Each structure stands twice: as C-alpha cells, then as structure tokens.
Amino acid sequence: MLVARESLAEHYKEVEAFQTARAKSARRLSKIIAAVAAIAILGNVAQAFAIATMVPLSRLVPVYLWIRADGTVDSEVSISRLPATQEEAVVNASLWEYVRLRESYDADTAQYAYDLVSNFSAPTVRQDYQQFFNYPNPSSPQVILGKRGRVEVEHIASNDVTPSTQQIRYKRTLVVDGKMPVVSTWTATVRYEKVTSLPGRLRLTNPAGLVVTSYQTSEDTVSNVGQGAP
C-alpha cells in the first residue's frame, strides 16, 4: 500500500501504536498462561499430597470373625483385642499351618509351601530350612521324592510349653509309588514371636503376625515300615 509522503509520520505512529498494543497483549497472555500453569502445578502437588496421606488407610487389615454362644457373629481387627480363646485359636492354627507346610511334601504345592514357610521364619530359621529344602542337599524331598511320592501330615495335638513356645505332635505318612506307606509320629517344638509390622500381603497368610524364631522336630514312633523313608 502506497502512503503519501505527508502522511508517513502519522502512518508510522499508527504502526508503532499497533505493535505496542500487540506486545502488551502478548505479555498479558503470557502472564495468564503462567498463572494457569502455576495453579495447575499447585493443584497437582496438593492432589499428590492428599493421595500420599491416604495410602496408609488403604493397607490390608485382617478381620477376625468368631461365633458367640448365642449364634451371633462378632469381629475384631486386632488379634490382641480378641477374646483369649479366640486369640489362642488363631495362634494355634497359624503354628499348625507352618508345621504342616514345612513337614509335608507334594511336588505340585512345593513352591507355595516353600514361600509361606520362608515368610513365616526368622532369618536363621529361614536359612536352615532353605538349605535343607533346596538342591543339591541329598536329604531334600525334592531329591529323594521328586514327583514319585509325597509326604502327608495330620495334626494330633498342640500344647503350650511356655507363652511363646509350643509343641505340636503330628502323624507323618510317606507315600512312594509302588511301595507301602510309612507312618510315623513326630513332635515339633516351635518358638515364636508376635510382630505388628508385617506387610499386608503377608498378613493374608499369617493373620496372627507370627515369626518362628526356633524350630526343632524329632521322631516319636514308627507304626509301620515299608521300603524305607527319606
């Protein structure tokens, strides 16, 4: 567009005013964008903080249920707040589950039993158990039996020796393909502690929060003998 010489000064003023207005508008827009971004960041930080504070509330908590004499059902979320007989029942069941999985053997469930016994055990007890069970220990049921046999155990009795020690008697039946079963009775002596800091995933299989700190087992009798026992 041609501009007359006498109008150049006025034209330059208009162009300068237009450019100044555009610059001011751009600065205002930048400030608005920066403010929106800052608000969004603060909102995200606040949301993250709220989620972080709520995470402990979402942890797994075991709930213990029992039936009263009148037939009603009651519950509690802490084993220490259970009635004495109910707390004792939970401890007895947990200790027997430990002994059952430690002393029995089946190739199909060996990994589950291995993991649970390991998680139930204090470091030294866990190390002893794993050294016994893992290859290449010749006494391991994996080596002796593999998939050719199994060991079944049945509960006989549980007795408290001290407040943190229990003796559990059980029947052990060795079944090997093509041989007569070997039945014997054994006694396991289990020393344990109660802990409150177990992760939620472990509480699912260890609701009493027990850690076995010492474990010994000895044979009582052999009621019938087949072709040999591991």
Swiss-Prot record:
Disulfide pairings: none
Side of membrane Periplasmic, spans: 62-230
Domain of life, source organism: Bacteria
TM spans (from-to): 39-61
Cell location: Cell inner membrane
Cell membrane found in the keyword field: yes
Cytoplasmic topology ranges: 1-38
InterPro entries given in the database record: NTF2-like_dom_sf (IPR032710), VirB8 (IPR007430)
Recorded GO CC terms: plasma membrane
Keyword flag Transmembrane: yes
Membrane topology type: Single-pass membrane protein
Keywords (A to Z) from UniProt: Cell inner membrane, Cell membrane, Crown gall tumor, Membrane, Plasmid, Transmembrane, Transmembrane helix
Family per record: Belongs to the virB8 family.
Function in brief: VirB proteins are suggested to act at the bacterial surface and there play an important role in directing T-DNA transfer to plant cells.
Protein name as catalogued: Protein virB8
Species of provenance: Rhizobium radiobacter (Agrobacterium tumefaciens)
